[in-house]
UniProtKB/Swiss-Prot annotation:
Biased composition (Basic residues): 54-65
Bridged cysteine pairs (disulfide): none
Region listing for Disordered, in residue ranges: 38-68
Family stated for the protein in its record: Belongs to the universal ribosomal protein uL4 family.
SUPFAM superfamilies named among the record's database cross-references: Ribosomal protein L4
Organism of origin: Pseudomonas savastanoi pv. phaseolicola (strain 1448A / Race 6)
Keyword rRNA-binding in annotation: yes
GO biological process, one term: translation
Pfam families documented for this protein: Ribosomal_L4
Protein name from the UniProt record: Large ribosomal subunit protein uL4
Gene: rplD
Origin organism lineage: Bacteria, Pseudomonadati, Pseudomonadota, Gammaproteobacteria, Pseudomonadales
Amino acid sequence: MQLNVNDAQAIEVSELTFGGEFNETLVHQAVVAYMAGGRQGSKQQKTRSDVRGGGKRPWRQKGTGRARAGTIRSPIWRGGGTTFAARPQDHTQKLNKKMYRAALRSILAELVRTDRLVVVQDFAVEAPKTKDLLSKLTGMGLTDVLIVSDAVDQNLYLAARNLPHVDVRDVQGSDPVSLIAYDKVLITVSAVKKFEELLG
């Protein structure tokens, strides 16, 4: 299939990578797995056994007329532990490499189908100036955009750093969440070829 390039003639690309059907279920699974993998999972609270003290029972079992109490660190008591205390846990979800690649292919194909993928021969700024990048993007009618190149250009990265709706990634650093989070994805021809190599 052919992919239109903004500032040059159309290029021939793999139907498998850029022309497949959109698998919403698979993309959802990939997004959830990616976001779950980013969770820290280190939250921890103290149960009755973790709280310091409370080893000796406050009063004897029988004969006082009061309710039975075995420890002053009971969750019912002030200064006691938490009833269902949070524990550190691993939130990662397993997703096969084949499924992950298929999800990325599905996203790229959908970007092409919905005219959200803007392909350019090359994209760079001469100096790390946000103003220069902003004027360049405005000239192309792009405001909310992910810029993907085969390798991150330092000037481009620094220029985009202060723009809230602009992100710069290389092909390896692109993930399901970043690819669907922006209105448009601006991608260079070399990045298209690299995606074909990785996902083909």
